[in-house]
């Protein structure tokens, strides 16, 4: 089951949990209200035939999908890619990920610019809105396999912070003010 919490400010190994003392957890409804990040639980034993996933793909027009495996054995330029994934950035399109195997962390900024860490495992699907600053890292198991979904041709272009003048960032900030 997915968990989310506010992170400490430690610069220790990014693959650790980084809980505050005491821990400050946040549930998925509150995460959505504060950030626009959506969470869905998909049947981890048969995710591609999951009714919820099929419905989401149709409603949101996800027309392209692929898989990514992040491990030292499977990902070319592993260390460089992980460094890029963990650099704070945003995208012009929403980022949709369904975890098939393994686990990892998506970190997103809240309205006060604090980090919220989202721990994802098989069956967890998250949708990170366009324009939100975020990053990704593996946990201490160093392995994740995930489906990626796109509308049309896949575009995965990170725009590193600062990117506050980008239209997608301005649109995101507007939604943040009005509420998701």
Curated annotation (Swiss-Prot):
<keyword id="KW-0539">Nucleus</keyword>
<keyword id="KW-0533">Nickel</keyword>
<keyword id="KW-0479">Metal-binding</keyword>
<dbReference type="GO" id="GO:0005506">
    <property type="term" value="F:iron ion binding"/>
</dbReference>
<dbReference type="InterPro" id="IPR004313">
    <property type="entry name" value="ARD"/>
</dbReference>
<keyword id="KW-0223">Dioxygenase</keyword>
<dbReference type="Pfam" id="PF03079">
    <property type="entry name" value="ARD"/>
</dbReference>
<dbReference type="GO" id="GO:0005634">
    <property type="term" value="C:nucleus"/>
</dbReference>
<keyword id="KW-0560">Oxidoreductase</keyword>
<comment type="similarity">
    <text>Belongs to the acireductone dioxygenase (ARD) family.</text>
</comment>
<dbReference type="InterPro" id="IPR027496">
    <property type="entry name" value="ARD_euk"/>
</dbReference>
<feature type="binding site">
    <location>
        <position position="89"/>
    </location>
    <ligand>
        <name>Ni(2+)</name>
    </ligand>
</feature>
<feature type="binding site">
    <location>
        <position position="95"/>
    </location>
    <ligand>
        <name>Ni(2+)</name>
    </ligand>
</feature>
<feature type="binding site">
    <location>
        <position position="91"/>
    </location>
    <ligand>
        <name>Ni(2+)</name>
    </ligand>
</feature>
<feature type="binding site">
    <location>
        <position position="95"/>
    </location>
    <ligand>
        <name>Fe(2+)</name>
    </ligand>
</feature>
<dbReference type="InterPro" id="IPR014710">
    <property type="entry name" value="RmlC-like_jellyroll"/>
</dbReference>
<dbReference type="GO" id="GO:0010309">
    <property type="term" value="F:acireductone dioxygenase [iron(II)-requiring] activity"/>
</dbReference>
<feature type="binding site">
    <location>
        <position position="89"/>
    </location>
    <ligand>
        <name>Fe(2+)</name>
    </ligand>
</feature>
<dbReference type="GO" id="GO:0019509">
    <property type="term" value="P:L-methionine salvage from methylthioadenosine"/>
</dbReference>
<feature type="binding site">
    <location>
        <position position="134"/>
    </location>
    <ligand>
        <name>Fe(2+)</name>
    </ligand>
</feature>
<keyword id="KW-0963">Cytoplasm</keyword>
<comment type="function">
    <text>Catalyzes 2 different reactions between oxygen and the acireductone 1,2-dihydroxy-3-keto-5-methylthiopentene (DHK-MTPene) depending upon the metal bound in the active site. Fe-containing acireductone dioxygenase (Fe-ARD) produces formate and 2-keto-4-methylthiobutyrate (KMTB), the alpha-ketoacid precursor of methionine in the methionine recycle pathway. Ni-containing acireductone dioxygenase (Ni-ARD) produces methylthiopropionate, carbon monoxide and formate, and does not lie on the methionine recycle pathway.</text>
</comment>
<dbReference type="GO" id="GO:0016151">
    <property type="term" value="F:nickel cation binding"/>
</dbReference>
<protein>
    <recommendedName>
        <fullName>Acireductone dioxygenase</fullName>
        <ecNumber>1.13.11.54</ecNumber>
        <ecNumber>1.13.11.53</ecNumber>
    </recommendedName>
</protein>
<keyword id="KW-0028">Amino-acid biosynthesis</keyword>
<keyword id="KW-0486">Methionine biosynthesis</keyword>
<feature type="binding site">
    <location>
        <position position="91"/>
    </location>
    <ligand>
        <name>Fe(2+)</name>
    </ligand>
</feature>
<keyword id="KW-0408">Iron</keyword>
<comment type="pathway">
    <text>Amino-acid biosynthesis; L-methionine biosynthesis via salvage pathway; L-methionine from S-methyl-5-thio-alpha-D-ribose 1-phosphate: step 5/6.</text>
</comment>
<dbReference type="GO" id="GO:0005737">
    <property type="term" value="C:cytoplasm"/>
</dbReference>
<feature type="binding site">
    <location>
        <position position="134"/>
    </location>
    <ligand>
        <name>Ni(2+)</name>
    </ligand>
</feature>
<dbReference type="GO" id="GO:0010308">
    <property type="term" value="F:acireductone dioxygenase (Ni2+-requiring) activity"/>
</dbReference>
<dbReference type="InterPro" id="IPR011051">
    <property type="entry name" value="RmlC_Cupin_sf"/>
</dbReference>
């Amino acid at each position: 089951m997915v968990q989310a919490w506010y992170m400490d400010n430690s610069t220790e190994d990014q693959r650790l949990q980084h809980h505050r003392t005491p821990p400050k957890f946040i549930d998925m409804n509150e995460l959505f209200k504060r950030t626009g990040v959506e969470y869905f639980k998909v049947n981890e034993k048969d995710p591609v035939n999951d009714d919820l996933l099929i419905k989401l793909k149709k409603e949101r027009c996800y027309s392209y999908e692929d898989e990514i495996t992040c491990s030292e054995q499977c990902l070319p330029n592993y260390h460089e890619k992980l460094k890029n994934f963990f650099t704070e950035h945003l995208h012009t399109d929403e980022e949709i990920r369904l975890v098939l195997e393994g686990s990892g962390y998506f970190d997103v900024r809240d309205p006060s610019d604090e980090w919220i860490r989202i721990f994802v495992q098989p069956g967890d699907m998250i949708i990170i809105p366009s324009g939100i600053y975020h990053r990704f890292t593996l946990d201490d198991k160093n392995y994740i396999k995930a489906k990626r979904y796109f509308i049309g041709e896949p575009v995965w272009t990170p725009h590193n912070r600062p990117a506050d003048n980008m239209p997608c960032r301005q649109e995101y900030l507007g939604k943040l003010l009005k509420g998701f």
